[in-house]
Every structure is written in C-alpha cells, then in structure tokens.
Amino acid sequence: MSNLKIMGPALPDMPWEERPAGSKEVMWRYSANPIIGRDALSTSNSVFNSAVVPFKKGKYNYAGVFRCDDTNRRMRIHAGFSVDGIDWDIREEDFKLVGGDAEIGQWVYGYDPRVAKIGDKYYVCLLYTSP
C-alpha cells in the first residue's frame, strides 16, 4: 500500500490530509467532518457532498452537486461552489437538468448526484430509472 498513485492532473490547491497513522485504507475520511453542515441552506435538514470537480470560474476553484434533504425529507439537488474545497457556497435554488431528451429534464428523485468533465463540458447525472 505504500505505492499509491493518484491518476489525473495535478491539483496543488486541493485540500489533503495524509493517511492517519497506522491506517492501511486506500481512502480515509477528513478528520474535521462534516465539511458541510446539515443546515447549510435555509430549508435543509441534511446535506450530502456527493460530487465535486475542479472548476475554475471567477474566484471559485471547485464546483459540486449536492443532495440537500429539506425539513420534509424531500431530496433535492443543489449546485455549490468553493474557493478551497472546504468552505462552500451552496445555491438555495434547486438544480435543473437539461438535455436533448425531454425525459432528462423531468424531475423524479434527487438521489446520489454525480458530475464529470468530459472534454470541455460538465455532465451531471443522478438516480435515473432504467427500463
């Protein structure tokens, strides 16, 4: 396990903690969890940071999509942006999906969002029912 290698471009400003002493885990939790409080939004009961990518725009270096359960436990998706990957500005308004297929924009369920950069575009997906 002493020969770990991160694949991808260098992210020198990415927050990082060394592996805890004695740990043999491939991945480990940040010692100051949770990064985002459960009441980060005016309507949130809980917030889950499912997907974050490097994103250079204005002052921001990171962007993410977050599952934010409201106080009625409805799962909604919200966009957020961060300078340092620790302190987040999460948008109050729900994230809207758009695409060439009208079905993409239909709201079903805000669960487990993911984001990826492919080429020069960012793609977001979440729970999607299959046939």
PLM feature segments, named:
Residues H78-D84:
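Beta-propeller blade signature
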